[in-house]
């Protein structure tokens, strides 16, 4: 969703700071911030609208990086998980589950939430480091961390904690 809490404004402002040499940013989705974003985005930003999941996965696989500039504590960091599953590093705000899903310098880079200058610096760093991310390790991490068995174990841990709290 193109909304404040997802950090779209931070992304657009970072691309403004990067100037005409910025890499192409492709923004998928729709939402309340869409009109503002289109009005303020530099030419290096493209808006696709809503995409089918398969198309989005292909786009992630072809991308140099995925961007997750979230300004809120998300319950599950879906974009980093999907990006890592196809071997794409992630530029993520260092906040909550989004930040925790990225290991700095291993499978992506962090930046301060809501800080367009810090995001622009992370983009520049990504452009300068070349292909130094371990794509195989990213995919293995995603498969180990985001599978049905792991999700079941985590869910059962949460349920047990809830039951323990209700019985105290």
Please give the residue ranges for each predicted region:
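A conserved mid-protein helix/loop that constitutes part of the nucleotide-sugar donor-binding site
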Residues: 1-17, 32-35
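Short acidic/histidine- and often glycine-rich active-site loop of Leloir-type glycosyltransferases
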Residues: 80-81, 94-105, 109-110
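A short, well-ordered alpha-helix in the C-terminal region of glycosyltransferases
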Residues: 107, 132-145
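Nucleotide-activated donor-binding/catalytic signature segment of Leloir-type glycosyltransferases, i.e.
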Residues: 35-55
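Acidic donor-binding loop of glycosyltransferase active sites
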Residues: 61-75, 88
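Short glycine-rich donor-binding/catalytic loop of glycosyltransferases
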Residues: 71, 88, 92-99, 113-114
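A structural motif in glycosyltransferase catalytic domains
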Residues: 11-12, 25, 119, 155
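Conserved acidic donor-binding segment of nucleotide-sugar-dependent glycosyltransferases
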Residues: 104-105, 109-116, 125-131
